[in-house]
Amino acid sequence: MSRNPFLDPTLQEILQVIKPTRADRDTRITVIDQLRDVLQSVECLRGATVQPFGSFVSNLFTRWGDLDISVDLFSGSSILFTGKKQKQTLLGHLLRALRASGLWYKLQFVIHARVPILKVVSGHQRISCDISIDNLDGLLKSRFLFWISEIDGRFRDLVLLVKEWAKAHNINDSKTGTFNSYSLSLLVIFHFQTCVPAILPPLRVIYPKSAVDDLTGVRKTAEESIAQVTAANIARFKSERAKSVNRSSLSELLVSFFAKFSDINVKAQEFGVCPFTGRWETISSNTTWLPKTYSLFVEDPFEQPVNAARSVSRRNLDRIAQVFQITSRRLVSECNRNSIIGILTGQHIQESLYRTISLPSQHHANGMHNVRNLHGQARPQNQQMQQNWSQSYNTPNPPHWPPLTQSRPQQNWTQNNPRNLQGQPPVQGQTWPVITQTQTQQKSPYKSGNRPLKNTSAGSSQNQGHIGKPSGHMNGVNSARPAYTNGVNSARPPSKIPSQGGQIWRPRHEQ
């Protein structure tokens, strides 16, 4: 395989644009706080907690990534089953409260989905949110992806690049019969498992069974047990991996990723992708996969035998394989920086990068780039698993800048309410960061969202994350047009768009 000398430095340029800034993180935390305020106005949801999950929690989101939010009804108590009908009813109440507040628009109730979801967009920040009820499974999977990303820093970079590439080629939308973002992350995990030498182990080495099955009994106890087992197994793998380290560059891993799945439409007829075992598995020999037929089977390692790629259609699978083939071939042959950008990114990224003059010092003849940790582990601020966030809920650190101490995944995930935390002794080890009101920002003195308008300059942090996007567009959707649900215009934007009020919590500087 010939090596493109400009690929590595160009990938770093792309990552610099798509990786979220601190302002992007703060903006999402502000949206979470605003949703908490609305939640308190819904009588049947008082006492429930707002818990983010998905790419924001796994630290695999881009600057314009959506927010996945779970409204947890039984935080910290026994794990109880919430029926689909009850979830639909509660989301209906929340929908009416969000509409009445005037701070949210493009409201859409996906009532008959496998997991009922309320889709909304925050009025000021223009962040899309998918809200569900008691999505403990999604939260658990997000934490596992975060733990995996801490094993090797190249994992996060490759996931971000693959997601941007997939969006650019219209193959990252489960609603249209292509990949969802979670299945793309699993493909990257599988790629890292099947490299030589392997970068990641089979996920059964990290957790020996379907983790979702262990979410029973007292939630705190169950989650702490999962975290402790995972921490010990990751530590063991990292110590053993030191004997054989894969030093492939990010560009080599990306090119081999596209090459590995370039015939996925052919392999999918006989084999399934199994990150749990870390190898291609014959579908006919796996009885748990047989009852249903899918165009592509990517087993969810944390909820077996669920197919994470069940949305991929046969017709689209052939097109997906063709996109893999073309991308693999062009990345090996193309030497032009702009053509690489055109292959891997969408228009809004291209417009930003094409305006950037590439300095000769950035693109050496040997293709190297002055970027630290190209082959190594996670970035310094992410080298260790997170501190005991739920025990120190007013700590100034945000979720993805953990201090350089401790090395275990979290314990005690479920202390979501600051009232339940005061006076508790510190717990050894670490817990998952629970974003609470006191962590994020102080309560705004303005009630009911009636905050004063404030002019926002084009270069302010509030506009970050919308690079190169025309006004009226958000995440590729024309937000200037109202959306209609069941014949009713539910997308009427507020006549006044409030600015962010109150004192916004800011993280301390990185070490």
From Swiss-Prot:
Residues 378-511 are annotated as: Disordered. It comes from the Eukaryota. Its EC number is 2.7.7.52. One of its GO terms (biological process) is miRNA catabolic process. Residues 381-392 have a biased composition (Low complexity). Keywords: Cytoplasm, Nucleus, Transferase. Residues 404-465 have a biased composition (Polar residues). It catalyses: RNA(n) + UTP = RNA(n)-3'-uridine ribonucleotide + diphosphate. GO terms for molecular function: nucleotidyltransferase activity; RNA uridylyltransferase activity. It is found in: Cytoplasm; Cytoplasm, P-body; Nucleus. Disruption phenotype: No effect on miRNA accumulation in the wild-type background, but increased abundance of the heterogeneous miRNA species in a hen1 background. Reduced 3' uridylation of miRNAs without affecting the 3' truncation. Belongs to the DNA polymerase type-B-like family. Uridylates small RNAs to trigger their degradation. Catalyzes the uridylation of 5' fragments produced by AGO1-mediated cleavage of miRNA target RNAs. Acts synergistically with URT1 in unmethylated miRNA uridylation, leading to their degradation. URT1 and HESO1 prefer substrates with different 3' end nucleotides and act cooperatively to tail different forms of the same miRNAs. URT1 and HESO1 act sequentially, with URT1 mono-uridylating the miRNAs followed by their further uridylation by HESO1. URT1 and HESO1 are involved in the uridylation and clearance of RISC-generated 5' mRNA fragments. This is Protein HESO1.
